[in-house]
């Protein structure tokens, strides 16, 4: 269970770095906003899901 927690936490950290770069780029390009909007929503949902999964696994591991 500890290895699963570490893998999910690592995925959250890497995905957070990707979102830190991707979100400002998507907001800075107004001509591609219609194409970027669904990706931002999906990325935000994945990030929230990873945060909740880390919280649940943290409760189970510790």
Swiss-Prot record:
Q: Which Pfam families match?
A: Ycf9
UniProt keyword GTP-binding, yes or no: no
Compartments, as annotated in UniProt: Cellular thylakoid membrane
Q: What biological-process terms (Gene Ontology) are attached? A: photosynthesis; photosystem II stabilization
State the membrane topology: Multi-pass membrane protein
Primary place of residence?
membrane
- From which domain of life does this come? Bacteria
Keywords (A to Z) from UniProt: Membrane, Photosynthesis, Photosystem II, Reaction center, Thylakoid, Transmembrane, Transmembrane helix
Q: Where are the transmembrane segments?
A: 8-28, 41-61
Q: Cellular component per GO? A: photosystem II reaction center; plasma membrane-derived thylakoid membrane
Report the protein's function. May control the interaction of photosystem II (PSII) cores with the light-harvesting antenna, regulates electron flow through the 2 photosystem reaction centers. PSII is a light-driven water plastoquinone oxidoreductase, using light energy to abstract electrons from H(2)O, generating a proton gradient subsequently used for ATP formation.
The record's family statement is: Belongs to the PsbZ family.
Q: Which HAMAP family match?
A: PSII_PsbZ
What is annotated about its quaternary structure and interactions?
PSII is composed of 1 copy each of membrane proteins PsbA, PsbB, PsbC, PsbD, PsbE, PsbF, PsbH, PsbI, PsbJ, PsbK, PsbL, PsbM, PsbT, PsbX, PsbY, PsbZ, Psb30/Ycf12, peripheral proteins PsbO, CyanoQ (PsbQ), PsbU, PsbV and a large number of cofactors. It forms dimeric complexes.
Write down what this protein is called: Photosystem II reaction center protein Z
Organism in which the protein naturally occurs: Crocosphaera subtropica (strain ATCC 51142 / BH68)
